[in-house]
A protein has these predicted regions:
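Motif I (Walker A/P-loop) of helicase-class P-loop NTPases
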Residues: 1
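Conserved AMP-binding loop of ANL adenylate-forming enzymes
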Residues: 4-46
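Active-site glycine/GP-rich loop and adjacent strand/helix microenvironment
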Residues: 42-326
Length: 326
């Protein structure tokens, strides 16, 4: 409870706030219960609505008037779409802040990525707070109102950023997040390698906090792709695809080619399947990351099923087949 209460405080929440929990606390999602207990610890009001069902979310907002929500940010776009379809003036709703979980909102320069920019354009009155967490951390690293990286709670976790040789990286360089938990009794971790690649900043934040700040996750160490001499991480590819009009959904597949090198296939769900659109996609990739993967068009429904297999709680956008194709 304490860790999430501190996270909410960093995001500017006070006991005067009412938070709408737009995530489940069931289906083995432990963080959902932590959010609920954290809000109670802070003495906020908290409404357990659960995930999905835009109609129920908007009915709750109308009836109770929450000031903030805890939400997977891409769901906010669905809330907006439902509101527009049903004549709800969402920009004048009671919601003023969203504590966003599970998906990145920022680039490494603290600007909005594609998802963050899209939500902000649709709903400028809603302030977005990016978070970074994992089960092993047992805490959240959360932005303050200056949105210059997530603040590490120094009384709960020790964070190091290390290179391939286990040496600390220089300020502003990418490194693997290595954590040591503090005060955890059940499963304490000493220098646990998360596999996440971030950039750390130690300069004092404008909010007055002097603890380390972390960028959004650049990628997973195990998901690094070396394609035609260029180092890529899946989130960079997601950001490009989600900014191309006409791309409804997608799955990125990586496999080992006949020469032992990484190869990328973009399986794209779209109503368009013409050569001009394929060229547009490849040209966009060349302009952003200097290389163009293979493009394969698939039915939107096929990709949707692949993204959410049975019993899956998280959407799949990246499939690593390299071990199977070596």
């Amino acid at each position: 409870a304490y860790n999430e209460a501190e996270s909410f405080t960093t995001a500017g929440c006070t006991p005067e706030d009412v938070l709408q929990l737009m995530t489940t606390i069931d289906r083995r999602f432990m963080a959902g219960l932590a959010y609920f207990l954290g809000a109670r610890k802070l003495r906020c009001g908290v409404i357990r609505v659960g995930n999905g069902i835009p109609e129920l979310q908007w009915d709750t907002i109308r009836r109770i008037g929450p000031t903030g929500c805890i939400v997977v940010p891409s769901f906010l776009t669905k809330l907006v779409a439902y509101a527009e379809e049903h004549g709800i003036d969402y920009r004048r709703s009671s919601l003023r802040r969203a504590i966003c979980i599970g998906e990145a909102l920022r680039d490494t320069a603290f600007g909005n990525n594609t998802l963050g920019a899209k939500i902000t354009e649709l709903w400028p009155e809603l302030e977005l707070f990016s978070t970074y967490a994992s089960t092993e951390m047992q805490t959240s690293i959360t932005e303050c109102g200056h949105h210059c990286g997530g603040h590490v709670p120094a009384d709960l976790i020790l964070v190091e950023l290390l290179d391939e040789q286990n040496n600390p990286v220089a300020e502003g360089e990418e490194g693997e997040v290595v954590i040591t938990t503090l005060g955890v009794r059940g499963m304490p971790l000493l220098r646990f390698r998360t596999g996440d690649i971030c950039i750390g900043y130690t300069e004092r934040c404008a909010c007055g906090r002097g603890t380390m700040r972390l960028s959004s996750v650049i990628g997973r160490k195990g998901q690094m792709i070396k394609f035609k001499g260029t180092t890529l991480y899946p989130p960079a590819l997601y950001d490009i695809l989600e900014n191309i009009p006409g791309v409804s959904n997608y799955i990125i597949e990586v496999f080992t080619g006949s020469l032992g090198t990484d190869q990328i296939v973009l399986r794209i769900g779209s109503a368009r399947r013409d050569e001009a659109f394929e060229k547009e996609i490849k040209d966009t990739f060349r302009s952003k990351v200097r290389v163009a993967p293979e493009v394969v068009f698939e039915p939107v429904e096929y990709i949707a099923k692949k993204q959410m297999p049975q019993m899956s709680r998280k959407q799949i956008k990246f499939v690593d087949l390299r071990e199977q194709t070596k």
